[in-house]
């Protein structure tokens, strides 16, 4: 029998452990009584052959009869059909009755190999089995996920919606080179507009520390310092809003290289996308709210400077702040911090006004004469200018004054007063 390992000839048995480890053919001599290979006999060591699985052709399976049920016109009867070669009488069944020995041992012997050579790579089957199990596990996990998605607790719907709103893609300095979807920018602008509206109402109705606005400090931790533990100041809040608005406007602004470098490596569409009316109006409203908040802050700061200058020993008088540049002290000046704050805010608003492309009478900062500042901004085109003028004219009174234009003018006046104080 081909599958019986004990009845095989000694010279056809499996290779010994030494030949199998070295992946060599194990030659055996039938004349010796000992069951040792020629290589072990020559070396004078004990030839050990581990028990291996039986090789050869597996025994044929017993053919089970199949039951065929036929339905007639009047009655149904069951016929038992034997699928054996003699019962069917088909030529396809008789073709399998060949007398050739197609066992694996004979094939391997004809090409100079043994079945034991493949036993070293039995771990390949072990490596393949986790792949199939992982696929079945993945299908099972998908089925469980579908069942869990169908049975959602209604109490978690509100929390899930708020998490999706809070996990919107933010525009930071790290991903500024990536394209931003216009609907995401519009939604982020709406959220920023809501924050600025709440801050504008709070700064008008609630008291805040005016003296802390003029305090200059040197932060050694850098930009990544966590300010959540300390009390939030209105100046810090509006400064963060300016930074966020500048990043959002950078995502909406069409790059200047889109028309001059069509064959660059970065993706630049041939036709730049048109801005929506809602995007332009929300961005303009955010800018006006920021200007209004800065106008309130600087008016309070100017009143504080007037009160401290009139009363030298007043309750608001603080010790002079000494600054050092290159190790040399700067003479103390009460209005130095106010002037530095004015220049800082002018530079911050200049970046936003440049991205928006506002005309001169809508700007707080001065526009450079030798540059084409604002021509590539959001309101730089003719259609955007028409929309800007139409939106401004809707709020004008009979005298041609407008609250938005008035807040821009008021901020410019109070900043000039602080500079000349």
Swiss-Prot record:
Residues 74-86 have a biased composition (Low complexity). PROSITE patterns: ZN2_CY6_FUNGAL_1, ZN2_CY6_FUNGAL_2. Fusaric acid is phytotoxic to plants such as cotton and banana. It has been shown to induce programmed cell death in plants. In addition to a mild toxicity to animals, fusaric acid exhibits acanthamoebicidal, antioomycete, and antimycobacterial activities. Its main location: nucleus. The keyword Isomerase does not apply. It comes from the Eukaryota. Disruption phenotype: Abolishes the expression of FUB1, FUB3 and FUB8, and impairs the production of fusaric acid. The keyword Nucleus applies. Pfam families: Zn_clus (PF00172). Keywords: Nucleus. Induction: Expression is positively regulated by the secondary metabolism regulator LAE1. It is found in: Nucleus. Residues 50-92 are annotated as: Disordered. GO terms for biological process: nitrogen catabolite activation of transcription from RNA polymerase II promoter. InterPro entries: Carb_Metab_Trans_Reg, Zn2-C6_fun-type_DNA-bd_sf, Zn2Cys6_DnaBD. One of its GO terms (molecular function) is DNA-binding transcription factor activity, RNA polymerase II-specific. GO terms for cellular component: nucleus. Residues 16-47 bind DNA. Transcription factor that regulates the expression of the gene cluster that mediates the biosynthesis of fusaric acid, a mycotoxin with low to moderate toxicity to animals and humans, but with high phytotoxic properties. This is Fusaric acid cluster transcription factor FUB10. It comes from Gibberella moniliformis (strain M3125 / FGSC 7600).
């Amino acid at each position: 029998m081909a599958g019986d390992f004990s009845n095989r000839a000694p010279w056809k048995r499996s290779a010994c452990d030494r030949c199998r480890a070295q992946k060599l053919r194990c030659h055996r001599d039938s004349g010796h009584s000992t069951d040792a290979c020629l290589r072990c006999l020559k070396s004078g060591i004990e030839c050990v052959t581990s028990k291996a699985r039986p090789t050869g052709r597996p025994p044929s399976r017993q053919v089970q009869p199949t039951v065929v049920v036929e339905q007639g016109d009047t009655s149904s009867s069951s016929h038992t059909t034997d699928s054996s070669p003699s019962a069917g009488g088909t030529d396809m069944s008789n073709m399998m009755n060949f007398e050739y020995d197609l066992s694996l041992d004979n094939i391997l012997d004809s090409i100079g190999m043994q079945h034991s050579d493949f036993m070293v790579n039995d771990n390949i089957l072990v490596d393949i089995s986790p792949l199939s199990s992982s696929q079945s596990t993945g299908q099972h996990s998908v089925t469980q996920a579908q069942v869990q998605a169908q049975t959602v607790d209604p109490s978690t719907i509100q929390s899930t919606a708020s998490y999706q709103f809070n996990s919107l893609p933010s525009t930071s300095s790290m991903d500024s080179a990536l394209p931003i979807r216009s609907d995401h920018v519009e939604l982020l602008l709406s959220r920023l507009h809501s924050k600025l509206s709440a801050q504008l109402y709070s700064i008008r109705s609630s008291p805040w520390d005016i003296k802390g606005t003029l305090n200059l400090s040197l932060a050694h931790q850098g930009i990544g310092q966590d300010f959540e533990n300390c009390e939030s100041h209105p100046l810090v809040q509006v400064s963060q809003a300016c930074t966020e608005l500048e990043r959002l406007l950078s995502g909406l602004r069409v790059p200047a290289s889109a028309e001059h470098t069509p064959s660059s490596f970065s993706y630049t569409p041939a036709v730049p996308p048109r801005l929506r009316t809602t995007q332009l109006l929300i961005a303009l409203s955010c800018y006006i709210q920021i200007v209004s908040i800065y106008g309130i802050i600087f008016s309070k700061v100017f009143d504080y400077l007037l009160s401290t200058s009139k009363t030298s020993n007043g309750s608001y008088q603080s010790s002079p702040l000494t600054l050092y540049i290159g190790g040399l002290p700067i003479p103390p000046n009460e209005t130095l911090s106010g002037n530095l704050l004015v220049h800082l805010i002018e530079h911050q608003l200049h970046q936003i006004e440049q991205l928006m492309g506002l005309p001169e009478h809508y700007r707080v900062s001065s526009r450079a004469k030798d540059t084409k500042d604002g021509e590539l901004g959001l309101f730089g085109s003719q259609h955007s200018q028409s929309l800007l003028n139409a939106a401004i004219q809707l709020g004008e009174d009979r005298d041609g004054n407008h609250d938005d234009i008035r807040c821009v003018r008021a901020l410019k006046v109070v900043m000039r007063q602080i500079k000349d104080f």
